[in-house]
Amino acid sequence: MNLTPREREKLLVSLAAMVARNRLSRGVRLNHPEAIALITDFVVEGARDGRSVADLMQAGAHVITAGQCMSGVPEMIEAVQVEATFPDGTKLVTVHHPIRHEA
């Protein structure tokens, strides 16, 4: 199987997101790379499903909460930028303050 560098990167993010989901299901708090991977995968898959950029920017901030992350991780991530492929082309999606404290 021959994959382009972009396809390899997407596959790696997807795998990291699977690991993060598995850890969350066991009650393990996420570290920085796992949190980024989970949010990134959410945006990439949402774009593939046909969701809008605005919708993903908004919904991406509710994928995980501060309580699901290791101490200090939410403060480390001010924004996550994802280049995702939408039905009408590739677009940059920015999720500001993606890990919020529970209300």
From Swiss-Prot:
Pathway: Nitrogen metabolism; urea degradation; CO(2) and NH(3) from urea (urease route): step 1/1. It catalyses: urea + 2 H2O + H(+) = hydrogencarbonate + 2 NH4(+). It is found in: Cytoplasm. Its EC number is 3.5.1.5. One of its GO terms (biological process) is urea catabolic process. Belongs to the urease gamma subunit family. This is Urease subunit gamma. It comes from Paracoccus denitrificans (strain Pd 1222).
